[in-house]
Amino acid sequence: MVECVKGRPNVLAIVLAGGEGKRLFPLTEDRAKPAVPFGGTYRLIDFVLSNLVNAGYLKIAVLTQYKSHSLDRHISVSWNVSGPTGQYIASVPAQQRLGKRWFTGSADAILQSLNLISDEKPDYVIVFGADHVYRMDPSQMVDEHIKSGKSVSVAGIRVPRHEATAFGCIQSDDEGNITEFLEKPADPPGTPDDPDVTFASMGNYVFTTEALVRALKDDSENEDSEHDMGGDIIPYFVDRGDAHVYDFSRNIVPGATERDKGYWRDVGTIDAFYECHMDLISVHPIFNLYNKEWPIHTTVEGNLPPAKFVQGGIAQSSMVAPGSIISAGTVRNSVLSTDVIVEEGATVEGAVLMPGVRIGKGAVVRHAILDKNVVVRDGELIGVDHDRDSQRFKVSAGGVVTVGKNQVV
């Protein structure tokens, strides 16, 4: 972690964590999207918070709203950095400071939380999303933002042009000035150096504070606005020639490998969430969780013992979290969270198992995501018969079977 250095610009980080995550249902049925477990021991929000903390930013407000109990608890338990130093990572629910209403959009969430900015009086405000899987040193983006002289910088990642229709797309000139910002266009623009590649917005922004406050207040008076950061606030600055694109490919993270440099995934769908897990488990993973120079921080609750393999139980090309027991069962190409039990004769292949899952004797689970505390009875088959699975569970376009929290099947 980078130490806070005297003379660095005063920065407040705001993490937007109020999203409902409808496309991840049923994983988001009882929790906010940033609270969804990921990678065996983490939650999605751990990635953005780790990036900020590793870069030395320790004044972080996490704006929450939708079913935030588990998210609030995770932040208070795993991210408690408060003390006499003035540092904090705080969960901030909707305050209704501007009337009896909840957040109506991401920009409105910050507008209703302007007291955080007035209290801290930062020079710059980082506004990052809470539900992406990646490593990034935000301080490099802040430094480039300051040099640009613009009021906002938008982090952009290069994606194939044909895939960019799912993102906010950035068109810029040779100097990095954003000339156009298009929300999910049918015909995405190319970059100045490659017409087959598009800058897609990562949903990460750095603002000069005064300009952000002015834009939020102007937006609040616009009856036609949806009060969205990407849809309304960023175009506000682009129209004024006051926006800069930060090329994520230039971000250098200590300890990154050539394979995972520039890795960023939007895990907003079941298929994307599943595939991102599969990126973790190869010998040379596409995304390496074992980078000690830029760790992903979290706290594993329960003081769990190490994973145990007994009676010939095996796990191949898999990640198995503490507290799990593989007893005469077989696990392949899977990610098992904490406190998972796989019993005699059971087979788990290409699966993501959340905390507390139980796989009964002789059961088979393939190409599936099982949410927290799911119990699979002895001899049950999941991911084997598509028609039967479709009648009982959600099956994604990519064929991933998802079983909701606490079900006994």
UniProtKB/Swiss-Prot annotation:
The keyword ATP-binding applies. One of its GO terms (molecular function) is ATP binding. Disulfide bonds: none annotated. GO terms for biological process: glycogen biosynthetic process. It catalyses: alpha-D-glucose 1-phosphate + ATP + H(+) = ADP-alpha-D-glucose + diphosphate. Alpha-D-glucose 1-phosphate binds at G168, E183, K184, S201. Homotetramer. NCBIfam families: glgC, PRK00725.1, PRK00844.1. Involved in the biosynthesis of ADP-glucose, a building block required for the elongation reactions to produce glycogen. Catalyzes the reaction between ATP and alpha-D-glucose 1-phosphate (G1P) to produce pyrophosphate and ADP-Glc. This is Glucose-1-phosphate adenylyltransferase. It comes from Corynebacterium efficiens (strain DSM 44549 / YS-314 / AJ 12310 / JCM 11189 / NBRC 100395).
